[in-house]
């Protein structure tokens, strides 16, 4: 019996043998098309079963919360053949239809690679970037369906909400990333035009799923908390009536042991923090004294889809290579010998033919990636435009005591949940950018001297949908200038950021801001684009550049005055850090 499309593109089969799966899918699609052509109009008995009135009602109610309700309804109605009894059913049906659309986009890209004449090297690279982001999108959507099957029983409601929103937010980001690869010149834009319709369709389908997920989880959380509040009040009233005093010990959450470590930190995590006594699974040394001579070789030899931490010790030295920690390389840790001693460096850049996405010296995608005591560097100068030192799409990733050094687009916080602590990030234009949910704590963020006529932008956040749980949070950091900029800072305007995408979200809080930052604080991208839809916030900052009296007057900018409002941007809430940061072994703060 011929396999069904669902079987062909099941998560397990897709991951086991992607090329075989996609070939089988192509054959299956041709077979289905042939059968459809023969049987068209033969009998009404073969038509898709229409939705029942009750399913229609559920569908319309669920789609009412989306940004594209007509698409939301028509996609499911056209597919037919499903019984919808809840909003979760509608979300699952919508996501499954989105998977089919993503599969179609895959074949569109493959066809362009094979048949399009005269593709430039960068266009070929951009198309392969699209294949990579399509691969990631398929994984994310399959995982979304699996998580929906478990909802709401296997995790807390907030964990479910965080995971589901992150998966779909990342899927949306991937569509934008594919298209962004064709934005460098006019020739690129012709290829972009061939992809645009399919990519935008998937992005809109994902947007609808995200809106429904947000509506469902927000409602369920509110109902749960209301019930918990009533239960708590009833218990309190009963205790007061009985004149009973209940003592609750919460001090343990912040207790320290005799050596000054938090009591909840395991011995293994303490060793990671101390940076000594950690057993490496592989050692990289340029002089041949380790297991491998290159970082890329060590990563290639690491196990795939591992649930156990795999530590790669990178000895002191300069490693001139480009490294990718792919999606299947999970739980990898890079441990250097010091941020000034272990350096991974490259020079890929847009001017010389790369895409921004592909220019990264190091790209970390496999989930739970950790790095400490390393410098990630791109030596392409300011004249080479976009040249990324580090790109991160790894969920639950963290970086401690690392340097990210480049000029334009230094740190690409691409997608998923990320954390940086005690790091140095230096650059010029948009040097912290992307659409992850990321918190940077206790970091030094330094603008460098750019080319003549350029302006420095610390951030360029890329949120494209108001329901994405993404943004850049800079907390308890120091924002200043490198020595080469400090003496000429008046000649090179420097800003906290500008809106790369329509719903750009950036928060600067509890940080020291030097006078390198101009009084208006923030800059436009172009004209009035995104000024009413962005979310830019400042809270409790200090320093000569922290004054807000002369800040921009955009509708999307606001100075936060209440701690309760700032709390939602902390590591505990914004990236759900309470559930995973302790496992990194790195220092962190969950609150203000």
From Swiss-Prot:
Tissues where this protein is expressed: Expressed in roots, cotyledons, hypocotyls, seedlings, leaves, stems, flowers, dry seeds and siliques. Accumulates in etiolated hypocotyls (at protein level).
Segments forming a coiled coil: none
Regulation: Regulated negatively by pectinesterase inhibitors (e.g. PMEI3, PMEI4, PMEI7 and PMEI9) in a pH-dependent manner, mainly in slightly acidic conditions (pH 6.0 and 5.0), especially in dark-grown hypocotyls; this processus relies on changes in the protonation of amino acids involved in intermolecular and intramolecular interactions.
Pectinesterase inhibitor 3, as annotated region: 53-212
A GO MF term: pectinesterase activity
Region (Pectinesterase 3): 281-578
A Gene Ontology cellular-component term: cytosol
Induction entry: Induced by necrotrophic pathogens such as Pectobacterium carotovorum and Botrytis cinerea.
Disruption phenotype: Early germination and reduced root hair production associated with lower expression of several pectin-degrading enzymes, genes involved in cell wall organization and remodeling and genes involved in lipid and protein metabolism, thus leading to a global decrease in proteolytic activity, however, cruciferin genes accumulate abnormally. Normal sensitivity to zinc Zn(2+).
Catalytic residue list: 409, 430
A matching Pfam family: PMEI
InterPro entries for the chain: Invertase/methylesterase_inhib, Pectin_lyas_fold, Pectin_lyase_fold/virulence, Pectinesterase_Asp_AS, Pectinesterase_cat, Pectinesterase_inhib_dom, Pectinesterase_Tyr_AS
Keywords assigned: Apoplast, Aspartyl esterase, Cell wall, Cell wall biogenesis/degradation, Disulfide bond, Glycoprotein, Hydrolase, Plant defense, Secreted, Signal
Function field: Acts in the modification of cell walls via demethylesterification of cell wall pectin. Required for zinc Zn(2+) homeostasis and to monitor Zn(2+) influence on cell wall-controlled growth processes such as root cell elongation. Monitors seed germination and favors root hairs production. Prevents cruciferin seed storage proteins activity, but promotes the expression of genes involved in cell wall organization and remodeling as well as genes involved in lipid and protein metabolism, during post-germinative growth of seedlings. Confers sensitivity to Zn(2+) when overexpressed.
Subunit structure: Interacts with BIIDXI and At5g11420. Binds reversibly to PMEI4, PMEI7 and PMEI8 to be inhibited; the stability of the PME3-PMEIs complexes and the inhibition of the pectin methylesterase (PME) activity is pH-dependent, based on protonation status of amino-acids at the complex interface.
Protein's recorded name: Pectinesterase/pectinesterase inhibitor 3
Biological source species: Arabidopsis thaliana
């Amino acid at each position: 019996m011929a396999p069904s499309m669902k079987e062909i593109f099941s998560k397990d089969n897709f991951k086991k043998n992607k090329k075989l799966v996609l070939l089988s899918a192509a054959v299956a699609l041709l077979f289905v098309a042939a059968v459809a052509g023969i049987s068209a109009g033969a009998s009404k008995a073969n038509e898709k079963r229409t939705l029942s009135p009750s399913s229609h009602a559920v569908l319309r109610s669920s789609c009412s919360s989306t940004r594209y309700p007509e698409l939301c309804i028509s996609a499911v109605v056209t597919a037919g053949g499903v019984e919808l009894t809840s909003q979760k059913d509608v979300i699952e049906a919508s996501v499954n239809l989105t998977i089919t659309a993503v599969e179609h986009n895959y074949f569109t890209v493959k066809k362009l690679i094979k048949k399009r004449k005269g593709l430039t090297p960068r266009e070929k690279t951009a198309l392969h970037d699209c294949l990579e982001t399509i691969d990631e999108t398929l994984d994310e959507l399959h995982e979304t369906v699996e998580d929906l099957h478990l909802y709401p029983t296997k995790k807390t409601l907030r964990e479910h909400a965080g995971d589901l929103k992150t998966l779909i937010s990342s899927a949306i980001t991937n569509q934008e990333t594919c298209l962004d690869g064709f934005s460098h010149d006019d020739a690129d834009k012709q290829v972009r035009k061939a992809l645009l319709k399919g990519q935008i369709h998937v992005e809109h389908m994902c947007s609808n799923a995200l809106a429904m997920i947000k509506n469902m989880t927000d409602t369920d959380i509110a109902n749960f908390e209301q019930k918990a509040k009533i239960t708590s009040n009833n218990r309190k009233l009963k205790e007061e009536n009985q004149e009973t005093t209940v003592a609750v010990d919460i001090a343990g959450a912040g207790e320290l042991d005799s050596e000054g470590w938090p009591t909840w930190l395991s011995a293994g995590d303490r060793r990671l923090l101390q940076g000594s006594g950690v057993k490496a699974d592989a050692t990289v040394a340029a002089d041949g004294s380790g297991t491998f001579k290159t970082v890329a070789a060590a990563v290639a030899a690491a196990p795939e889809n591992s649930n156990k931490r795999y530590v790669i010790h990178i000895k002191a030295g300069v490693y001139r290579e480009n490294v990718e920690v792919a999606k299947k390389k999970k739980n990898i840790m890079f441990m250097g010998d010091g941020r000034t001693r272990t350096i991974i460096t490259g020079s890929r850049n847009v001017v010389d033919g790369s895409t921004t996405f592909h220019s990264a010296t190091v790209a970390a995608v496999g989930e739970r990636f950790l790095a400490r005591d390393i410098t990630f560097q791109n030596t392409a100068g300011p004249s080479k435009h976009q040249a990324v030192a580090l790109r991160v799409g790894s969920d639950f990733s963290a970086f401690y005591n690392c340097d990210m050094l480049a000029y334009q687009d230094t740190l690409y916080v691409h997608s998923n949940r990320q954390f940086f602590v005690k790091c140095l990030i230096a650059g010029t234009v948009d040097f912290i950018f992307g659409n992850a949910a990321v918190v940077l704590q206790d970091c030094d963020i330094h603008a460098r001297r750019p080319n003549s006529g350029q302006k420095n932008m610390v951030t360029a956040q890329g949120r494209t949908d108001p329901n994405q749980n993404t943004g850049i949070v800079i907390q308890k950091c120091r924002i200043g200038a490198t020595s080469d900029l400090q003496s000429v800072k008046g000649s090179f305007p420097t800003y906290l950021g500008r809106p790369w995408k329509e719903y750009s979200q950036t928060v600067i809080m509890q940080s020291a801001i030097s006078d390198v930052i101009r009084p208006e604080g923030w800059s436009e991208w172009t004209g009035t684009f995104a000024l009413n839809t962005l979310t830019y916030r400042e809270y409790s900052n200090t320093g000569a550049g922290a004054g807000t009296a002369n800040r921009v007057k955009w509708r999307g900018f606001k100075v936060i005055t209440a701690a309760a409002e700032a709390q939602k941007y902390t590591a505990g809430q914004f990236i759900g850090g309470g559930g995973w940061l302790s496992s990194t072994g790195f220092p962190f703060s969950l609150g203000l």
